[in-house]
């Protein structure tokens, strides 16, 4: 009798564990499919942003909204994307830097805004699909070469400004958008 009760208890416990494992396996499958669907949606969104950025580069009407700025000797600072940007529209290039400082600066926002005519515009795509986009800027307060580097599959971009008369290069890291979709505030230019 005791053996029969013990066998029934083991059978009930074993059956319960088996059902729990089946439910756990079902949850794992659901989580895996959910994770895969989420990853596919994120990848599709990034590819759509990349396609818009490539089209904006081809039309020469774009804005790089920077969230991080890196100075000559590697010092970097996180900044606002609405006040730190590099843009090109109608043959005019604008470079604006506005750090989070107390001093207002020449542009009224804690930095400097320079504008000039863009020339010698070149675009190259390497075998991996990464894009390098360069142009020269000449204007009041700026004489420089600007080089953009955008990785395939994303609109994340890095623009480096190389001045012609000194070595105080500066890099802007952020996302590249078509000019019409950008959300930037332009300060006073020099």
Regions inferred by a protein language model and the residue ranges of each:
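N-terminal post-signal-peptidase region of extra-cytosolic proteins
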Residues: 48-50, 66-81
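Residue-level detector of beta-strand structural context in well-folded domains
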Residues: 53, 84, 146-148
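Bacterial Sec-dependent N-terminal signal peptides
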Residues: 1-28
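Mid-length scaffold segments of soluble, non-membrane domains
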Residues: 77-130, 135-136
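Helix-rich interaction surfaces within compact, conserved domain-sized segments
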Residues: 30, 120-190
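Sec-dependent signal peptide cleavage junction
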Residues: 18-58, 63
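Surface-exposed, interaction-prone regions used to assemble/regulate multi-protein complexes
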Residues: 56-67, 183-189
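Solvent-exposed coil/turn segments that connect beta secondary-structure elements
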Residues: 67-69, 89-91, 98-100, 138, ...
């Amino acid at each position: 009798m005791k053996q029969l009760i013990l066998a029934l208890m083991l059978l009930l416990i074993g059956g319960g564990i088996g059902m729990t494992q089946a439910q756990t396996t079902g949850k794992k499958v659901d989580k895996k499919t959910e994770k895969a669907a989420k990853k596919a949606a994120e990848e599709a969104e990034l590819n759509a942003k990349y396609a818009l950025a490539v089209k904006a580069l081809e039309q020469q009407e774009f804005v790089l909204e920077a969230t991080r700025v890196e100075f000559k000797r590697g010092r970097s600072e996180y900044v606002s994307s609405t006040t730190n940007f590099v843009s090109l529209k109608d043959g005019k290039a604008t470079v604006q830097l506005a750090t989070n400082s107390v001093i207002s600066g020449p542009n009224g926002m804690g930095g400097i805004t320079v504008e000039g005519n863009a020339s010698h515009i070149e675009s190259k795509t390497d075998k991996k699909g990464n894009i390098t986009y360069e142009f020269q800027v000449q204007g009041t307060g700026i004489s420089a070469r600007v080089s953009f580097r955008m990785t395939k599959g994303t609109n994340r971009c890095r623009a480096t400004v190389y001045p012609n008369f000194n070595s105080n290069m500066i890099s802007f890291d952020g996302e590249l958008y078509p000019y019409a979709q950008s959300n930037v505030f332009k300060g006073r230019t020099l």
